[in-house]
Amino acid sequence: MPYYTRDDNDVDDFDEFDPTPYSGGYDITVIYGRPIPPSDETCYPLSSGVDDDFEYERPEFTQIHEPSAYGDEALNTEYSSYSRPKPRPAFRPDSGGGGHVQGERPNPGYGSESGYGRKPESEYGSGYGGQTEVEYGRRPEQSYGSGYGGRTETESEYGSGGGGRTEVEYGRRPESGLGSGYGGRSESEYERKPSYGRSEEQEEGYRKPSYGRSEEQEEGYRKPSYGRSEEQEEGYRKPSYGRSEEEQEEGYRKPSYGRSEEQEEGSYRKPSYGRSDDQVESYIKPSYGRSEEQEEGSYRKPSYGRSEEQEEGSYRKQPSYGRGNDDDDDEQRRNRSGSGDDEEGSYGRKKYGGNDSDEDEEKKKHRHKHHHQKRRDEDDE
């Protein structure tokens, strides 16, 4: 039994429920009446008939009142003091606090807060070399640096604490560069750039940072040599990945992947991957398993396992895949007549259960495969 047994429309299903407003609705004019048009009896006039000398800005609506902080005169004085400094208004008594009009000197009431940039009279910095509130970079007249390592000369600017450096401009020579505390450096070292393990004879001119490079490489601008020998370093060369140096001396060449050097001396050739030398004499398309007698002719379609007798002719119309030359025409006739021995598309393999009338084809294939294997062994040597 499902949990919800009621209809979805029964939203308010209790006993004393009148469904009339939900089903039929109600008319608001029937229940509340029609709205009456505006008239002088029911509506206020648009402009209030109050005299003009009545001030709405006053906090209390009386003709005689105390001068308010929100009055026009006080507001004008307050707002004009923000943009440009004016003398203090006469009617405001001098308040004994820090609150003063900005831009004027505060009366030294309580606290006498020293404005930043003014010279403090004498403020004793407490703590570990606590500094007085002066401008950074100015020399304080008297800074009594208490704590360990506090210095009392005038040259000591904020130099308290263990090995604290004097805060001077970097590049100037400080007056006394003997660092108080531990680890003070001498003054001549701050004029140099920090040398990370570089020797001083490398410091003479601008050089790129040498990470472990020898100094004879450091004489002129060179590209970083990662393990290249120095005779390769003389001119701009492309990176040689295992090529011998006499190949690099002859000029710009494409990278040779296992090509012999007598292949390198000719003009532009396509990269030969393991081809023998006599194949590379002229521009030849890549031969996939073709014999060398096939390579000597002009443009031919690629022969996949064709015999050499077929390759001696010119461009043939239909590529024969693994068939002999003598039984080419009668094989085509038999395939057109649909004799069942369809050797088309067999790609050099005999179908199972086919006729064994082409043993000479097997001999040719075996001889071609043996010749291809012998040439590949020669290339490996």
From Swiss-Prot:
GO terms for cellular component: cytosol; plastid. Residues 166-175, 186-237 have a biased composition (Basic and acidic residues). Keywords: Phosphoprotein. One of its GO terms (molecular function) is phosphatidic acid binding. Coiled coil: none annotated. Residues 364-374 have a biased composition (Basic residues). Residues 1-20, 36-381 are annotated as: Disordered. It comes from the Eukaryota. The modification Phosphoserine is found at residues 339, 346, 357. InterPro entries: PLDrp1-like (IPR038943). This is Uncharacterized protein At5g39570. It comes from Arabidopsis thaliana. The lineage of its organism: Eukaryota, Viridiplantae, Streptophyta, Embryophyta, Tracheophyta.
